[in-house]
Amino acid sequence: MSRISRQAYADMFGPTVGDRVRLADTALWVEVEKDFTIYGEEVKFGGGKVIRDGMGQGQMLAAEAMDLVLTNALIIDHWGIVKADIGIKHGRIAVIGKAGNPDVQPGVNVPVGPGTEVIAAEGKIVTAGGVDSHIHFICPQQVDEALNSGVTTFIGGGTGPATGTNATTCTPGPWYLARMLQAADSLPINIGLLGKGNASRPDALREQIGAGAVGLKLHEDWGSTPAAIDCCLGVAEEMDIQVAIHTDTLNESGCIEDTLAAIGDRTIHTFHTEGAGGGHAPDIIRAAGQANVLPSSTNPTLPYTINTVDEHLDMLMVCHHLDPSIAEDVAFAESRIRRETIAAEDILHDMGAFAMTSSDSQAMGRVGEVVLRTWQVAHQMKLRRGPLAPDTPYSDNFRVKRYIAKYTINPALTHGIGHEVGSVEVGKLADLVLWSPAFFAVKPALVLKGGMIVTAPMGDINGSIPTPQPVHYRSMFGALGAARHATRMTFLPQAAMDRGLAEALNLRSLIGVVNGCRRVRKPDMVHNTLQPLIEVDAQTYQVRADGELLVCEPASELPLAQRYFLF
């Protein structure tokens, strides 16, 4: 039997079981747990390679073969870190297994035929497209920035750069919901809209859900009173949609105890649960320990660095329409920015108490940095806290699974869309991101949307090959014309579907129906289920979880940073 060195094999077909891969310039390493391919029967495309007629490519009709195969991919997802071929059919993940020609090769369950396209994923990492669940729809160009960072789904609200949208993630009322759904129909990204949840009577909330809102957002700038919270959650329970909340920083209508009492045992998604982005000062972070609270962070506080506090004060004044010449506005801003709770947030993420990360796009958050900042936190926490059991000093598989779940499967489950997106699993939309390991979490090599390339780095268009400088991200055919409608999804609630809303608005995209929002609890947050008793000292702002003081020094240097953005 012929033999090949492990290094030569990895160079040719990518890493296999037992091989370790470093994630960009972080301190994080993953180890391949399983290889679905068969040694000696691997498929690869190119001159003199395997995927040729009668060899790795069979004679079957298109109905019996894949539309697209990603060969020899290293999949990193919440369920595992594995080597496999990925078969895509009709824009969805059809098979994760062994590609080739079943007429001449054993163990093939990803058939390659004359109607099959190939993407060479040898030496590449494949992850699910990110789900950003805190979007202010301030400008449509956010979509390009997000796609270029590896995010393929938006949940949020807004109507453009209106004063209300600059501060709150709400698309208020049926008219604006209709217009934004029509606008979203042309954007090459999955979208679900949040309506305004601040009302003390239910009819206006039911009206918005019937008009297409997949969730409701309670925001202190509209008045997050106990009455509004109770009313909003009552409607959510009735109509199976999610509620997101930005609580009362000033504690005017009640403190955190009053908010938790108004919520009761009903499921709710708490935005920027640390508090710098808004919420009961100084102790909204306590909510992360509740079984019915699904806590997320927005990315400006991630990770805690020597510049975090200074940057936040200026951001806050702009986003919430505050006046630096008014003492009360300055006091409001300063009450929200606390070093101690920001530092504790990173640790609570590492412990699995905070379940999600998101952006807060252009409203105290950066839409293109959800993925990047999530992994910066993971890196910092490995340096500060060492390996997470059962990891070793040489492999960080569990930590990697915990952190990737924060911006993929967990926000998808939270908002009732986990059956369509959020992971690399059979049956889901083929929203996939390819990364070279050296550029992981920073600059994708390709982004697939519904099985079609939607954006990619591309060189000189007049070049004789695709790679000459200048290379920068450009929209691809998946983002153009009617192809967008076949590869993107608009999410709607069942109430809107029952009214025939998609037909009434002439929406041409795929439609996904949110469901199961009210059943999701903290134990359902993949790899992020911890429910510690969190305490905050009202004078010093020190944070304890189950009695342990949570402190860490701010970072002065980070990976995934300047060395990647010189050009």
Curated annotation (Swiss-Prot):
Provide the protein name: Urease subunit alpha
What does the entry list as the binding residues for Ni(2+) 1?
Answer: H134, H136, K217, D360
Q: Where is the signal peptide?
A: none
Q: Which residues form the active site?
A: H320 (proton donor)
EC number(s) on file: 3.5.1.5
Keywords of the record, alphabetical order, are: Cytoplasm, Hydrolase, Metal-binding, Nickel
* Localization per record: Cytoplasm
Q: Which organism is it from?
A: Pseudomonas putida (strain ATCC 700007 / DSM 6899 / JCM 31910 / BCRC 17059 / LMG 24140 / F1)
Q: Which PROSITE patterns match?
A: UREASE_1, UREASE_2, UREASE_3
Which intervals of the chain form a coiled coil? none
